Protein backbone atom coordinates (compact mmCIF):
# COMPACT_ATOMS: atom_id res chain seq x y z
CA UNK A 1 0.00 0.00 0.00
CA UNK A 2 2.99 2.31 0.36
CA UNK A 3 3.46 2.48 -3.41
CA UNK A 4 -0.14 3.63 -3.84
CA UNK A 5 0.41 6.54 -1.47
CA UNK A 6 3.77 7.57 -2.90
CA UNK A 7 2.69 7.46 -6.56
CA UNK A 8 0.72 10.75 -6.49
CA UNK A 9 3.62 12.55 -4.80
CA UNK A 10 5.83 11.46 -7.72
CA UNK A 11 3.37 12.04 -10.56
CA UNK A 12 2.11 15.46 -9.48
CA UNK A 13 5.47 17.27 -9.83
CA UNK A 14 6.33 15.15 -12.87
CA UNK A 15 3.15 16.15 -14.69
CA UNK A 16 3.44 19.73 -13.41
CA UNK A 17 6.95 20.08 -14.85
CA UNK A 18 7.05 17.76 -17.86
CA UNK A 19 3.69 18.68 -19.41
CA UNK A 20 4.35 22.46 -19.58
CA UNK A 21 7.86 21.76 -20.89
CA UNK A 22 6.47 19.58 -23.71
CA UNK A 23 3.75 22.14 -24.45
CA UNK A 24 6.25 25.02 -24.63
CA UNK A 25 8.67 22.97 -26.75
CA UNK A 26 5.94 21.98 -29.22
CA UNK A 27 4.70 25.57 -29.40
CA UNK A 28 8.27 26.80 -29.99
CA UNK A 29 8.83 24.26 -32.77
CA UNK A 30 5.45 25.14 -34.31
CA UNK A 31 6.37 28.83 -34.38
CA UNK A 32 9.84 28.10 -35.75
CA UNK A 33 8.42 25.92 -38.52
CA UNK A 34 5.77 28.40 -39.62
CA UNK A 35 7.82 31.56 -38.94
CA UNK A 36 4.77 33.43 -37.65
CA UNK A 37 6.77 35.94 -35.62
UniProtKB/Swiss-Prot annotation:
Record field: transmembrane: 9-29
Cite a GO CC annotation.
photosystem I
InterPro entries in the record: PSI_PsaI, PSI_PsaI_sf
From the UniProt record, list the coiled-coil ranges.
none
Statement: the UniProt record of this protein carries the keyword Magnesium: no
For the keyword Lyase, the answer is: no
Q: Give the matching Pfam families.
A: PSI_8
From the Swiss-Prot or TrEMBL record, state where the protein is found: Plastid, Chloroplast thylakoid membrane
Q: Name one GO biological process term.
A: photosynthesis
| Membrane topology summary | Single-pass membrane protein
What keywords does the record list, in alphabetical order? Chloroplast, Membrane, Photosynthesis, Photosystem I, Plastid, Thylakoid, Transmembrane, Transmembrane helix
Q: Which family does it belong to?
A: Belongs to the PsaI family.
Provide the function of this protein: May help in the organization of the PsaL subunit.
Name of the molecule in the record: Photosystem I reaction center subunit VIII
Q: Which organism is it from?
A: Cucumis sativus
Question: Gene behind this chain?
Answer: psaI
Amino acid sequence: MTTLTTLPSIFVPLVGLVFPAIAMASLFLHVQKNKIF
